[in-house]
């Protein structure tokens, strides 16, 4: 068997590879999150966020990397793999990591509002699940945080410069709150 390219304990190195993927997302004006999946000291999958490009809310870096890794190993089980991601996984991505039986998740910057690896909740080690992932947090945290902060500062500047009409209204697509009225017994919902 080939010797691993890099020592398995090199979280710093593999997070650097995830940061390279995040930089690709940044350049594409996607939220700059990158992920790599490592097995036996080798990167078997790499991905960056592609939500805007693919017009797919599930096209997070972690989801894309897990799918690639499963194809690379020829199995949906990733029991001997580590997922490296620049930002704490959301509930969807954490759930996918648990279902794929990823052994360990390593992330850069935490997300106290929506993170599911200990930030807002911890799906990776949820007590009632029979599968859990080991967690390593804070690897190259400052670099991961810095890229996200720069990205969102630039996005706010672009929106501000373009004026209030540029953002297409509320992101929910719902009418303004003053246009809502309660449903009555005779109202029907659009199908």
What are these regions (language model features)?
Residues 66-100, 104:
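Helix-adjacent hinge/juxtasegments
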Residues 29-33, 77-79:
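Short, basic and Ser/Thr-rich N-terminal targeting/leader segments
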Residues 53-63:
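A short, polar/charged loop-to-alpha-helix boundary motif
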Residues 33-39:
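Short beta-strand scaffold segments in enzyme catalytic cores
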Residues 1-25, 89-92, 96-191:
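Zinc-dependent deaminase
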Residues 39-40, 67:
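A cytosolic small-molecule/anion-sensing beta-strand core signal
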